């Protein structure tokens, strides 16, 4: 276990903007890049991707903030090997500013931990969400990258954070249930004017990941009018399971493992693509998501 330390970050004393401030204005207040990792279903590796992506972004000296957006039952601190003295509940309860909850994670990244077992924080009311987004925007200005690990599902708090972020990364696996839930999440984001970037996890081959992404994009394009672009595939890799069991991110514990290499490639793409755009595909049907993927 690492000994967590509070990170001294100056807090702006400017008056808070009114609750009517919209998400677009909050997003413009962020100087660095912001990524939200979202999934429609739990158990697809979302938190693991968020943690390891944050660490991959930090490899070249970037200042990275990792936010556990599952405020009621997150696990970012566990995967980082931390036992923080404070978490986001202290801020939401008014005990300290948002920066006062930060701990130092692996490679010096800043980690904003969530609470554990606080059911009252699973969904924040509108004024609290507005306050959080404003303060998170202020805090994010001090970092080159902010990576937010969102709760699974389609709650209002998670959706607000997904809309706030510049780049929503939608994670799924080839599992039919995961694909169906990912499609539902993409549909909600599309209704709010956002097209996520797709990452397919736990693929047996690169061809399998590409085929899953093609079918997903075809279905989304036909029904939603916007197709998520495939931004990466992550292989099924025992190194990821071993690292999780040891509470050690795999990009640190197994830097040469195939999954670590792919996460670094994803981080590189995020850093070099100024304005990533989704791609258009021919029309399709939702049932196309569940057709078997041919063997490579």
Specify the residue positions occupied by each region the protein language model found.
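NTP-binding/hydrolysis catalytic cores, primarily Walker-type P-loop NTPases
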Residues: 247-296
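G-domain G4 guanine-recognition motif of GTPases
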Residues: 40, 173-174, 196-211, 233-240, ...
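P-loop/Walker-type NTP enzyme "switch/lid" segment
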Residues: 39, 66-141, 238-249
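Inter-motif core of Ras-like GTPase G domains
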Residues: 138-141, 155-176
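Beta-strand-loop-alpha "switch" segments that mediate conformational coupling across diverse proteins
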Residues: 224-251, 263
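Hydrophobic positions on the alpha1 helix immediately C-terminal to the Walker A/P-loop
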Residues: 49
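Extreme N-terminal, non-catalytic leader segments
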Residues: 1-44, 55, 62, 96-100
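Conserved C-terminal guanine-recognition region of P-loop GTPase G domains, centered on the G4
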Residues: 179-193
């Amino acid at each position: 276990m690492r000994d967590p330390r509070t990170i001294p970050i100056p807090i702006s004393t400017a008056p808070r903007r009114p609750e009517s401030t919209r998400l677009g204005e909050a997003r413009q207040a962020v100087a660095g890049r912001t990524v939200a990792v979202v999934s429609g279903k739990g158990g697809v590796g979302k938190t693991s991707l968020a943690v390891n992506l944050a660490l991959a972004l930090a490899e070249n000296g970037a200042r990275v903030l990792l936010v556990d957006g599952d405020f009621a039952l997150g696990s970012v601190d566990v995967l980082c090997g931390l036992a923080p003295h404070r978490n986001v509940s202290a801020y939401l309860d008014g005990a300290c500013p948002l920066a006062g909850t930060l701990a130092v994670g692996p490679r010096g990244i800043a980690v904003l931990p969530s609470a554990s077992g606080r059911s009252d924080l699973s969904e924040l009311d509108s004024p609290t969400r507005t306050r959080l987004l404003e303060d998170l925007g202020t805090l994010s200005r001090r970092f080159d990258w902010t990576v937010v690990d969102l709760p699974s599902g389609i709650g209002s708090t998670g959706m607000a954070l997904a809309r706030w972020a510049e780049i929503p990364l939608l994670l799924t696996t080839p599992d039919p249930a995961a694909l169906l839930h990912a499609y539902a999440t993409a549909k909600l984001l599309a209704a709010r004017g956002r097209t996520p970037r797709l990452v397919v996890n736990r693929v047996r081959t690169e061809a399998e990941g590409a085929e899953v992404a093609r079918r997903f994009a075809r279905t989304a394009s036909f029904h939603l009018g916007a197709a998520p672009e495939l931004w990466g595939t992550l292989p099924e890799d025992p190194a990821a399971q071993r690292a999780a069991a040891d509470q050690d991110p795999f990009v640190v514990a197994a830097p040469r493992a195939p999954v670590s290499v792919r996460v670094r490639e994803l981080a590189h793409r995020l850093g070099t693509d100024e304005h990533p755009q989704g791609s258009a595909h021919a029309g399709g049907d939702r049932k196309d998501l569940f057709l078997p993927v041919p063997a490579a």
